[in-house]
Each structure stands twice: as structure tokens, then as C-alpha cells.
A protein has these predicted regions:
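Juxtamembrane intracellular "pre-TM" segments in multi-pass secondary transporters
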Residues: 1, 179-208
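Residue-level signature of mid-helix packing/kink "hotspots" within the transmembrane helices
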Residues: 49-57, 141-142
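C-terminal membrane-cytosol helix-exit motif in multi-pass small-molecule transporters
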Residues: 165-184
Length: 223
């Protein structure tokens, strides 16, 4: 594993930590901030998921037409700007718009990050590299959620937002330090499901969805 690869793993960990610092906290802060029911605030997460998947068919084109690292950094920057907006959201519409923008950019940033990680890993080490890279995301989720709860208890919601943005900026710094060799565009279509929805991946994807569903439902309720 090269230094560039470890920089990408660190950037991935920080990116996921940044997003998951806010996720558990938003579920009970937004109802108070906006004066609406918890179930209605949950629409934000549905908007995030829908937007994240909506960006998928365009990922292959963007990473072919533009530099992969630039797609990652640009998406992460807009995502962090949307996350900062949660501190100032004062209506249901603004909440949904912020969640949608965050979802699109998070989807593009994570998929571009995976592409960069694969590009900088030798073919003989890609299986091990993919495993390490995936674990960096999992650790980022856990660390981010724990840090979010702790900061909220000690300092309040806005501190969590600012800390999440700061962590994301640090992740962008590590990603910007990665060297990615130039690859000539191959002329992919603007919208394509070829590298997004693979028929043989549906069963593992469903398995991961069901496993992640349990802690996703329980964590906000337990708090």
C-alpha cells in the first residue's frame, strides 16, 4: 500500500465521519428547530438517499470527462456547504433542499473516491485495497456518530455542524495530496447504468441494506 493510498483512506474516513457526525443528531434536533414532527423530519433522510442514488447514473461520465480527484473535491466542497446550512435551516423546504444537495454530492464524492483508490492501487493488491478502503468508511461512520453525540451533549448543535465541516475540510486536504496519473477519456454517455446498477450485486446490496437498517433505526431511539 502506497502513501497515496493511505491518504485516500484517511480522506475517506474523515469524509464519512463528517457526514455521520450530523446524521444521528439531526433526527431529534430538526423537529425542535423547525417545530415539526419527527416523522416529517425523517423525510430529510429519504431525500438524501433518493438524491444520492439519482447521481449514480452520471458518475461514470463525470469521472471520465473530468479528473476523478477534481470530481471528489468539488463534490465534497458543495456537500460541506450544504451541511453548514443545517445550522441555519428555518423551514421544511430548506431542510429538504439541503438534504438533497448533500445526498447528490455525497454520492458523487464517495464513488469518485472509490475510483481514485482503485486507480492508485496496483492490480495485484486491489482486493486488499478495497477491503481496507471499505473499513476506513465503516470506522468513519462509528467515529463520526460517537463524536456527534458527545459534541452535542457538551456544546450544542451548531458546534457539531462546525466540527463536521472542519473534519470534512481536513478530509479534502488529504484527498488533495493524492497523486492520480492522467487517464485519457474514453467517451462514455452522460447517463449510464452500466457501472452503477449491476444485476449480480443486488443480493449483496440487499444484505447490506438489511444489516444497516437495524442500527439506523435503533440509534436515534436509544438516544
Amino acid at each position: 500500500m502506497t502513501l497515496n493510498f493511505w491518504r485516500m483512506c484517511t480522506a475517506n474516513l474523515l469524509l464519512f465521519a463528517s457526514v455521520y457526525m450530523l446524521f444521528p443528531v439531526l433526527s431529534f434536533v430538526m423537529p425542535e428547530q423547525l417545530g415539526m414532527s419527527v416523522s416529517r423530519t425523517g423525510d430529510m433522510f429519504l431525500a438524501f438517499i433518493a438524491a444520492m442514488f439519482a447521481a449514480g447514473p452520471f458518475h461514470a461520465y463525470l469521472c471520465d470527462e473530468y479528473k476523478r480527484k477534481n470530481v471528489l473535491l468539488s463534490s465534497a466542497f458543495v456537500m460541506l456547504a450544504a451541511m453548514a446550512g443545517y445550522a441555519f435551516a428555518d423551514s421544511y423546504l430548506k431542510l429538504m433542499l439541503l438534504a438533497s444537495v448533500q445526498g447528490v454530492c455525497f454520492g458523487l464524492a464517495t464513488t469518485a473516491g472509490i475510483t481514485v483508490a482503485i486507480d492508485i492501487t496496483t492490480s495485484t493488491r486491489r482486493s486488499a485495497g478495497n477491503l481496507v478502503y471499505a473499513w476506513s468508511a465503516r470506522l468513519g461512520m462509528l467515529a463520526g456518530a460517537c463524536a456527534g453525540f458527545l459534541l452535542y451533549d457538551l456544546y450544542g448543535f451548531r458546534t457539531v455542524v462546525y466540527a463536521a465541516v472542519a473534519v470534512g475540510v481536513l478530509g479534502m486536504y488529504f484527498a488533495s495530496r493524492v497523486y492520480v496519473a492522467f487517464r485519457a477519456p474514453i467517451g462514455l454517455r452522460l447517463c449510464s447504468l452500466d457501472r452503477f446498477l449491476l444485476p449480480r450485486a443486488w443480493v449483496p446490496a440487499l444484505n447490506m441494506l438489511l444489516i444497516a437498517f437495524v442500527p439506523g433505526v435503533l440509534l436515534p431511539l436509544l438516544y
